[in-house]
Amino acid sequence: MSANLMMITLRLIHLIFGAFWVGGAVSVAFFILPAQRAIGQPGMLFVRQLMMGQKFRSYMIGAAVLTILSGLTMYIRYVMAGGGWAQTNTAKILGVGALAAIIAAGIGTGYTGKIGKRMLELGGQIQASGGPPTDAQKAEMGSLQGKMQSAFRIVAILLLLTVAAMASARYL
């Protein structure tokens, strides 16, 4: 594969999967999770189906991995080409954007995964009891939902900062 074709392929992977990742994170953080909290139990069932049944979480993780790996590969190829590119403002700004994306991926896969697992466990306990949730279960679920929404907002903001860095890097 020629160098140009390789870079075009990497760039397409980076842009397409990055757009999906950012759009998904922003949608979940600012629209889906707030709506889920507002409507209560039916909203929780919807989010569970979205994340587990429709495998949205898996697709988001896959998009994050492909976006980061393709971006790092392009970055390394530019650095290896020499010419002092790594010392330019463009390279530094792209590096900051990459770091923000990597942090977002860590929060989005690690921290939210732990919260989601506990939410599923608690939901299963509530369902198995056959009755309404106890006050303690309601309080814990509310706390978990708040943490999940906050984490997704942080992820979304980090990814929007990443997009801003990527879009402006060559002009600064």
For the regions a language model picked out, list residue spans one by one.
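Polytopic transmembrane helical bundles with strong interfacial aromatic enrichment
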Residues: 1-172
